[in-house]
Amino acid sequence: MEKSKLAGEQTRIEDLGGNKYKWTYGSVSDTILADGTDQPTHFGKTISIAPEGANNWKMVIKNDGKVLSSMTHALSEDGKTQTIKGTETKPDGTTSDFNVVLKRVGSGSGWEGTWESTDVKFTSPDEWEIEAYDGDGLTFNTPAYQDVLSMKFDGKDYEEKGPNVAPSSTSAGKRVNPHTLEVTNKVKGQVLDHTKFEVSQDGKTLTLTIREIGQPKALTIVYDKM
C-alpha cells in the first residue's frame, strides 16, 4: 500500500444555517444537522456530528445501528486545514486507525468551503482474495469487510454483497487485455466510479486506478501479492 496515492479527493461543505450543513462528495450530497443525532445519508447509513467547541467536530458513522467509524475533525486556527483522526471498525471485528489532512481549496470560512485531502494514512492495509468464477469470471472477496463480488466481464451488472455494502450495489466490466480489466460501479443505477485493474507483467502487483464521478483526480491503490 506504500505505493498507493490516496490523496486528492475533494469534499464540499455548505453552511445552510441553523447548524445544518450540506456535504457533497463526488456525485453524492447529504444534508446533516450537526446536533449529535444520527442523520440518514444517501446510501442507507447514518452520520452524527456533534460540535465540540468552535473548531472541532465529533463524527460517528453507523450502519444498522452499528458503529463503522468514529472520528474527530479539527479545524486549524487560520481555517486553512482540517485534520481528521479516527478509528474504523470492520465487520470481522478488527479495527484500523486513520489520519487525514485536508487543505482548503478556494474561498470559504469556518467549515464551509471545498476541502481536498493532501495526506491519507491507515494503520491496517486492506487485503483482497481473487478467485476464478464460473469459467472466465472472477470473485473479489475482502475478508475483513465480509464483502463479496462475483462477476463476469460481459458488460452486465453483477450485485455486490456484504454487511456494509449499500443496497443495490452493482458492478459491470470488460477485459481490455490479459492483464487489464475495466469496471463501472453503481448504486441503484447511479454510476459512482470507473475503476481500472492492472496486473503487473510479473504478476506480483495489482494496481487499481479509481476515477470517481465528480472528483478532479484519480486515486491509485497498489496491492502486493502475498
Model-derived regions, located:
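Hydrophobic small-molecule pocket/channel-lining residues, especially in calycin-type beta-barrels
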Residues: M1-M226
